Design a protein with these regions (language model features):
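N-terminal loops that bind phosphate or other acidic moieties
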Residues: 2-72, 78-158
Length: 158
């Protein structure tokens, strides 16, 4: 369900869930780069905690969502404990869930949300963009140098 606010922004809560403080770091980085973000929160799993405590804190974030808000959860590691906790909660909550989150992808997701895309559209687009968020810098610089020197055979596309 795509519900727009009067400003044309989709009502969507995004919850970052990770091992340790990675999700907090993502949150702080986005605030530094994009400014304060409404309806963006984070939950981290720490060594002294069990999965049930993590699930409880994730569930608390889900319950903070407004009735008309979609919920998009972004986890750090496929089949990691945070991922598994969210999957278990998906039995009781209608949430979207992407895993393998990183800074460039999160930035794209937040920008898409701000441009009125719903969670389903964001998930589809994020999967397409994911491959572009990791770069081989050595190859990039080598190919860039080759382009500057007039080598037409370099493989870089940027």
């Amino acid at each position: 369900m795509k519900t727009l606010t009067k400003e044309g922004v989709v009502n969507m809560k995004i919850v970052l869930v990770s091992h340790g403080s990675f999700s907090k770091g993502l949150f702080e980085t986005m605030e530094m780069v994009l400014g304060p973000q409404e309806d963006l929160s984070y939950v981290g799993l720490y060594p002294q905690e069990g999965i049930d405590a993590l699930k409880g804190r994730i569930e608390d974030e889900f319950q903070k969502a407004k009735e008309d808000e979609e919920i998009l959860v972004l986890t750090d590691l496929f089949y990691g404990s945070p991922f598994n906790a969210v999957v278990q909660l998906m039995n009781d909550y209608d949430v979207y869930h992407l895993t393998g989150i990183n800074v460039p992808l999160l930035m794209e997701i937040l920008l898409m949300r701000g441009n009125g895309k719903c969670a389903a559209e964001i998930c589809e687009e994020a999967i397409k963009l994911a491959n572009e968020t990791v770069k081989d810098v050595k190859k990039y610089l080598t190919d860039l140098l080759a382009l500057e020197e007039g080598d037409e055979e370099c493989e870089t596309s940027f």
